[in-house]
Structure formats: C-alpha cells, structure tokens
C-alpha cells in the first residue's frame, strides 16, 4: 500500500472511531458482553487473526498474564476452533475436550470472538494494524503440499486435508464425494493424519456412528468397498512419523488385520537397544504387528478379519496410473528406495527399481502448508511460513505470528500451545520494554466493526456461535451422536442470527 493510501486508511479509521466515540463511552460505562467495564481507554488492544488452537492459546496467555489487555479474535468461518473442529479425528473426542478451555477464553471479559470475517478480503491487515496496538497472525495452514507427479489430478486422487475436511464437516469440502468403490486404497505418508484416514476407511460403521463424523461421510463409508489400505513412506520403519497412540489404534482396530512385508524389517530388532525410549516402544509395537507370530486369540481375530492394512516402506510415488478411459486412478507406480547415512542424517535414495500397485483410491498425506494472507505481510514462499524471530514478524513492527504459520505444520496440539504461549510472551515482553508502543488510544474492534458495517459484513459473535453449537448438538442427539455439524455457511449464519 502506498504512503498516501496508508494515510487515507488511517484517517478513515480515526474518523469512524471519533464518530462512535460517544457510543464507546456509553459502552465503557454500562458494559456489554465480551468487553470489560474496567478496561481503560489506553489499555493494550491486540488483534488475533485465526480462531483455531494457535489463536485461542495466544489469547489465553495474553488475558491471563496481563490484566488490562483487550483481545479480539477474527475468524473467516462463522464457527471457532479451527483444526480441533475440522482436523481432529471423529473417534478422538478426548482431544476435542480442549474446546472447553477455548470456550472459557472466548467468554473472558477481555476477549471477543468475531467470526465470518475474512482478513485480507473484508478487512486488510494494515487496517487491523491501524485499529490495534498489535496484530498476531495465527491463521494456520490452508494449503496442501502436492506430490508433483503425473496423474495426481485424476479422479480418485485426494489430499488428506480435503478428505479429512470431508468427513469432519469443513464447508469447502462438503461436495468432495470420494469414490470408495475400489478394494484397495493407497495413502502416501506415514504420519498421524495418514493413520487417521486409514482408520476412518477401515473402522466399523457401528463405531463411527457414535462420533461427530458428518452423516454424509458416514453414509458413504457404510457403502464403501475399500477392504485394504496401504500406508506408504519413502523411508524405513525406524523413520515412521506416527506416534505410538495412533499405531496402537490401528493394531487394535476391530475387524482388521495387519499385512506387512517381513523383508522390510530385516535388522530392525537388533537396533532396538540403541533407540530412544519413545522410538523404541513404537518400533517394538510395529515389529510385533509385522513379524511376530500371533497368539491363538490374536490369530483367530486376524483370520476372521475382512479388512487389512499395512505399511509399505522405502517407496516414493512416481506416477498415478490411469484407468483405460484415462479419467480415474487405477494404480500407482512407486520408486523403490534404499537408505543411506545414519541417525538423523539418514536419507532415501532411489535404487532404480519400480513397483506398480493396483488401487482405485490415492490419498496424499505429505503435509499441509500455509498461504499468504495479505500482500502487506512478509511471506517465505519456499518455507511456507511468515518470516519471524521468536514470533515477531521480520521488518514489521507490531506484527506477530503463532502456530503453523510461524513454524510450519508440525507437531500436536500441545506443540501449538507452547509455541503460541511463546509468541504471547514475546508480545508482552515488547510492551514491558517499550519496544511495542501502547500509549496511544486505538479504536480496536469499534473501528473495525464500523469498517465492516460499511462493507456489508456482519460478524458472528461467540454467543451467536453458541446458537449454532446448540442446534448441532440437538441434531446429533436425534441420531445418537455428540453433534451433527452444519456444512453450509449460509445455514450457520441463518441459525446464528435467529
């Protein structure tokens, strides 16, 4: 934005703020839901972009640590909680319990939620910077890493992100309609998301129907012909990226049996003593499932199983093979790798051999990536993160970042919590040292709300979200589920404004 345009933007926000000054004074005197009646006019005002775990954890630390800070969370969807709502597997309700903590934060007197606001479109980051003392970008990773191989645009090939969004009710993925008429599915990637997808494909419907999986996904999975899932990785058993919890769930999944190549585990048992305890436990469980002779009870269970899963190691995708009509996926060609190096420096190197696997469903689980949100915000396209130092966006005073857009899409929710707390601490330290000036009066949400009103944008408050929450819970109860998620943004807004 030019200096002239930036100046006009600043004047516009200040005018809107002065026009609403009387309203602001009345609000401070009488108080409204979500605002503190004791917050002085010069208190620090912080805007957080993104209503997922990173945003809520950043807000939590700010309002708990400093008693005068006012925090506003802006989220593009009408519903909060981001990856907890749309990324956590339906059969992991215990992970979603963190929503209770986020709800407490959203109900805090000095924290407000503003859903249905698209930062970068409805309001720019520069406009937010004019309205707040600090802006924290916590909007996560909306993009997918692509395989970059021929055939990945064929029907029957999906990203894990889109597939997860489909069964978890992300509005943008509600029309995905994956074709599950094939017998074999191949998942590329061996992290927790890959195992979540495998588990959803193979889980008995009687288990899934008690979760908050969307009804359209449940109906599709009930009719699925998928009976075999291969989970493919480019490195070996000692580098598998999932955690022991997710692996144990696969091993114990009712109605399934593991099918793996014993040759891929040669020499692994001899390395156990040298492994760190978490990796050792994971590898022991993997070896038990792959090559140990099962006991009588386990053998009977496996013999009765109608579905199978297994890891395939040292394989890299070369091409998705098309059907005879060149429309659908009919298989995948894999390069066979070998490992070179030791320890953390081990790398996969192609041997020149290839292997073709017949399959009608290919799901790529090779990672998410963040995307730029606004031309005014620096972005490292190669690393797919906002360049930062301890959460401070480089060369941009008053702008911070937390979560995946800060460090990349890695780790579990606890990792994001610690990362977000770190950014909040950095911001508060800057206030304490005076490097972040909070002495001037900023309009905060009052100024932004005036801008949004002029542009015809109606934000969704947290109390509005609670109407959606109640209706989803009611619909779920009629089906014996925790909730039945709304899939259409228009319907969400209609319920919120009823």
Curated annotation (Swiss-Prot):
Give me the stretches of Basic and acidic residues compositional bias.
469-488
Which GO BP annotation is one of this protein's?
cholesterol metabolic process
The taxonomic lineage of its organism, from the top, reads: Eukaryota, Metazoa, Chordata, Craniata, Vertebrata
Citing just one GO molecular function, the answer is: oxidoreductase activity
Its family remark reads: Belongs to the ferredoxin--NADP reductase type 1 family.
Binding positions for FAD? Answer: 54, 75, 83, 119, 404, 411-413
Q: What class of enzyme is it?
A: oxidoreductase
Question: Localized where?
Answer: Mitochondrion inner membrane
Family matches, as InterPro entries: FAD/NAD-bd_sf (IPR036188), FAD/NAD-binding_dom (IPR023753), Ferredox_Rdtase (IPR055275), Ferredox_Rdtase_adrenod (IPR021163)
Which EC number applies? 1.18.1.6
Protein name, per record: NADPH:adrenodoxin oxidoreductase, mitochondrial
- What cellular-component terms does GO give this entry? mitochondrial inner membrane; mitochondrion
């Amino acid at each position: 934005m030019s200096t002239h345009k930036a100046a006009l933007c600043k004047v516009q926000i200040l005018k809107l703020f002065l026009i609403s000054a009387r309203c602001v004074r009345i609000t401070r005197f009488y108080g409204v839901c979500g605002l503190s009646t004791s917050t002085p006019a010069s208190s620090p005002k912080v805007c957080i972009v993104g209503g997922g775990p990173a945003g809520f954890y950043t807000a939590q630390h700010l309002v708990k640590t400093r008693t005068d800070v006012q925090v506003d969370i802006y989220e593009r969807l009408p519903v909060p909680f981001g990856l907890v709502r749309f990324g956590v597997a339906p059969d992991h309700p215990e992970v979603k319990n963190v929503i209770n903590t986020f709800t407490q934060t959203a109900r805090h007197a000095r924290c407000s939620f503003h859903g249905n606001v698209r930062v970068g479109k409805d309001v720019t980051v520069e406009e937010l910077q004019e309205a707040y003392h600090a802006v924290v970008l916590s909007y996560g990773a909306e993009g997918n890493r692509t395989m970059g191989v021929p055939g990945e645009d064929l029907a029957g090939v999906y990203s894990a992100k889109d597939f997860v969004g489909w069964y978890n009710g992300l509005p943008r993925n509600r029309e995905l309609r994956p074709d599950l008429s094939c017998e074999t599915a191949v998942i590329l990637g061996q992290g927790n998301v890959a195992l979540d997808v495998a588990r959803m494909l193979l889980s008995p419907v009687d288990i899934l129907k008690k979760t908050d999986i969307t009804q359209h996904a449940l109906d599709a999975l009930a009719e699925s012909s998928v009976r075999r899932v291969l989970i493919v990785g480019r490195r070996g058993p000692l580098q598998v990226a999932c955690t022991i919890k997710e692996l144990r769930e696969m091993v114990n999944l009712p109605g399934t049996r593991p099918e793996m190549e014993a040759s891929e585990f040669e020499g692994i048992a001899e390395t156990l003593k040298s492994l760190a305890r978490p990796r050792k436990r994971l590898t022991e469980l993997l070896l038990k499932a792959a090559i140990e002779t099962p006991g009588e009870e386990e053998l009977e269970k496996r013999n009765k199983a109608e579905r199978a899963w297994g890891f395939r190691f040292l394989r890299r995708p070369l091409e998705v093979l098309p059907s005879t009509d060149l429309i659908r996926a009919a298989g995948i060609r894999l390069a066979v790798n070998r490992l070179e190096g030791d320890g953390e420096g081990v790398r996969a190197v192609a041997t020149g051999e290839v292997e073709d696997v017949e399959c009608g469903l290919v799901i790529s689980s090779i990672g998410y990536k963040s995307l730029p949100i606004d031309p005014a915000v620096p972005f490292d396209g190669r690393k797919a993160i906002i360049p930062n130092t301890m959460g401070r966006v480089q060369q941009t005073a008053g702008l911070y970042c937390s979560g995946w857009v800060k460090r990349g899409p890695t780790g579990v929710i606890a990792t994001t919590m610690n990362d977000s707390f770190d950014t909040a601490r950095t911001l508060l330290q800057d206030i304490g040292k005076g490097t972040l000036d909070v002495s001037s009066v900023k309009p905060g949400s009052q100024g932004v709300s005036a801008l949004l009103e002029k542009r015809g944008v109606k934000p969704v408050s947290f109390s509005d979200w609670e109407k959606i929450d109640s209706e989803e819970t009611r619909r779920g109860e009629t089906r014996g589920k925790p909730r039945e998620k709304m899939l259409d943004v228009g319907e969400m807004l209609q319920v919120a404004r009823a």
